[in-house]
């Protein structure tokens, strides 16, 4: 079973449509939920297929950041889940920038959670090892089981 979930705060100074647009640069979601936490809206976007990450897959190659992406993705594996964060303001202009902490993105980071039976298989598809910036392999997208 596959579940991809993206969570982002929408602060009072932000436009929810701009945050959705920033996320859409990297992720095609099937379902959207919003909940309120005080004055902050929390967007929760979900998909049940790894195909929802095809834009993310393409951007990693276009920006030539496979090595750093692999590091962040591998570091984020816990059990059958991969968790990582990206900079919200960079995402708003279509640039993918990983962050280690929510504090590195002044308006809050965009948080990704990918649940898959074998998370390393997903990492190998999204961000394979490289030699001199060239991927050592190009795995097909893992099946949505």
Curated annotation (Swiss-Prot):
- HAMAP family xrefs: UPF0201
What is the name listed in the Swiss-Prot or TrEMBL entry for this protein?
Answer: UPF0201 protein LS215_1276
Q: Which InterPro entries match?
A: PAB1135-like (IPR002739), Ribosomal_uL5_dom_sf (IPR022803)
Q: Which PANTHER family would you find in this protein's record?
A: UPF0201 PROTEIN TK1335 (PTHR39652:SF1)
Gene3D superfamilies linked to this entry: 3.30.1440.10
- Per its UniProt entry, which superkingdom is the organism in? Archaea
Q: Which family does the similarity line name?
A: Belongs to the UPF0201 family.
What Pfam family does this protein match (any one)? Answer: RNA_binding
